[in-house]
């Protein structure tokens, strides 16, 4: 006689069968998500709640688990996107130990072929925010990591756009490194005769002399040592140009002081800047020939009156060379031993001294800005461009062409119509706002004489925060500047190049990303 199964065993078997049925139904729904949409809303909600209660009975734990799962999913997408963005051209240039200038001239016999079209377009999983037009996008450009396809193509073409500037003369301040250096190369490769000012003329000459096409334009380049903090020197330089040059078509007021560097930052260049002239290579000496030449007749008498007191003799003869002026200690921090903050032999991508200070000008509040720095910033960013634009206008009017340009290189820090304004670096904001006001006020006057004056924002090229903070932002916030120095250079010379190529000369505007923006 067979024993009857216990009632509890039968119940277990029935429950197991029901569980297997439930699993099969859930797997069917997982394979075809549209099935759940066919359920009445009440049953669908009960199903969601039942599954959730089984997975995590506690509502708080369930919410936390859901948030954690979403965060993990986002992290996975971001890791994928980081790989895509990491492969862009602008990221590759940033990883290079030393920035090299793009060679925009193809070799002889080269035939253009767009190999990029042969590649499958790269897509991001998370929608990106375009730096220029602010629209969302997912297709990633081969060079830019923060622009939509349309903006990226436009900006990429601008990097290599040239114009025929043969026979024209351009003045560029701050043309030794970074944006100024790239702008100088662009003007030279357009055929212009270029006058460059910098505090470190020998270092500047060596940099230009290292370009592969140096021989093509070296005879059209002259470099002058000039410290824009010293207003009498700026006046004297303008007087010298008036006496030695027959024409001037373009002025690019690029030099600026954003982050003040103490003398130790520049110390590594002093040996080269103060060495005997015969120790310099011949090509470097040629670029500096006009800078070292004696002043023209009447030059000294015309500039001596610039002294605070006319009884002071030898005004310019007693002034230190511009490079040595960088070693004058003006603030208490300039006297501190700083070898650990500016380690010898450690240079950045632009072959400039590494600055390891934990705090710099970019972090200062109003009550923290030294008076010396306040004055320096105004002198370099606003006063010097004012003097240059004013004193050299007669030189610009010596020739009849009405397609001349003045570019006052500005920044969004100087913009009043801006929704968000930080409380930091008010002195640089003031200086750029003053520069913009000069453009806004005087552009019409200069336009009447065929000179087109504009302010131009370079774009976001550099993270000005101290090195440690900037490095941490890359890791923690995935922050990378959206542009590089070639983009910045293309922006500041675009009023000239676009004007010459199109015949449409913009004037009296504040230009951002090649287009007018609010003041």
Where are the regions that the model predicts?
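Active-site helix of classical SDR
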Residues: 389, 427, 431
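N-terminal alpha-helical interaction blocks
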Residues: 19-127
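Active-site-adjacent segment of SDR/Rossmann-fold oxidoreductases
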Residues: 245, 441-451
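C-terminal helical subdomain
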Residues: 293-344, 472-519
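Conserved glycine-rich Rossmann-like NAD(P)H-binding loop of the short-chain dehydrogenase/reductase
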Residues: 190-208, 222, 250-255, 260-288
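A glycine-rich helix->loop->beta "capping" turn
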Residues: 121, 218-222, 240-253, 265, ...
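Canonical Rossmann dinucleotide-binding motif of NAD(H)/NADP(H)-dependent dehydrogenases/reductases
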Residues: 156-201
């Amino acid at each position: 006689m067979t024993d009857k199964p216990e009632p509890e065993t039968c119940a277990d078997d029935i429950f197991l069968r029901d569980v297997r049925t439930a699993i099969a139904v859930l797997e069917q729904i997982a394979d075809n998500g549209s099935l759940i949409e066919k359920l009445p809303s009440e049953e669908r909600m009960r199903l969601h709640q039942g599954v959730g209660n089984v997975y995590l009975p506690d509502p708080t734990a369930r919410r936390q688990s859901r948030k954690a799962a979403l965060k993990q999913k986002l992290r996975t997408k971001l890791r994928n996107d980081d790989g895509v963005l990491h492969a862009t051209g602008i990221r590759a240039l940033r990883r290079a130990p030393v920035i090299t200038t793009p060679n925009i001239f193809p070799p002889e016999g080269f035939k253009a072929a767009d190999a990029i079209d042969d590649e499958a377009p790269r897509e991001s999983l998370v929608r990106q925010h375009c730096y220029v037009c602010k629209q969302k996008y997912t297709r990633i450009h081969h060079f830019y990591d923060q622009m939509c396809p349309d903006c990226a193509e436009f900006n990429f073409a601008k990097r290599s756009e040239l114009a025929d500037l043969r026979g024209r003369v351009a003045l560029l301040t701050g043309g030794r490194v970074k944006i100024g250096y790239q702008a100088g190369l662009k003007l030279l490769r357009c055929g212009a005769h270029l006058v460059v000012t910098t505090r470190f003329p020998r270092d500047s000459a060596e940099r230009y002399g290292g370009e592969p096409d140096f021989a093509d334009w070296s005879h059209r380049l002259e470099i002058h040592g000039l410290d824009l903090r010293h207003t009498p020197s700026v006046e004297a330089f303008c007087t010298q140009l008036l006496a030695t040059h027959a024409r001037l078509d373009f002025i690019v007021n690029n030099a600026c002081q954003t982050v003040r560097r103490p003398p130790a930052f520049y110390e590594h260049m002093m040996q080269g800047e103060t060495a005997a002239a015969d120790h310099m290579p011949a090509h470097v000496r040629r670029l500096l020939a006009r800078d070292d030449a004696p002043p023209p007749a009447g030059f000294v008498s015309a500039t001596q009156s610039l002294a605070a007191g006319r009884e002071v003799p030898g005004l310019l003869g007693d002034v230190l060379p511009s490079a040595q002026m960088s070693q004058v200690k003006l603030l208490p921090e300039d006297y501190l031993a700083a070898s650990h903050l500016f380690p010898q032999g450690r240079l950045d991508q632009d072959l400039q001294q590494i600055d390891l200070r934990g705090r710099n000008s970019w972090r200062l509040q109003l009550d923290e800005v030294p008076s010396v720095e306040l004055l320096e910033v105004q002198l370099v960013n606003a006063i010097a461009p004012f003097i240059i634009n004013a004193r050299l206008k007669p030189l610009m009017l010596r020739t009849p062409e009405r397609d001349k340009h003045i570019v006052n290189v500005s920044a969004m820090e100087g913009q009043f119509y801006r929704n968000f304004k930080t409380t930091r670096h008010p002195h640089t904001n003031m200086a750029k706002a003053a520069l913009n006001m000069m453009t806004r006020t005087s552009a019409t006057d200069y336009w009447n004489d065929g000179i087109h004056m504009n302010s131009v924002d370079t774009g976001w090229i550099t993270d000005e925060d101290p090195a440690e903070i900037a490095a941490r932002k890359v890791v923690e916030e995935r922050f990378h500047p959206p542009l590089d120095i070639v983009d910045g250079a293309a922006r500041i010379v675009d009023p000239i190049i676009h004007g010459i190529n199109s015949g449409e000369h913009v004037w009296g505007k504040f230009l951002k990303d090649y287009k007018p923006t609010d003041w």
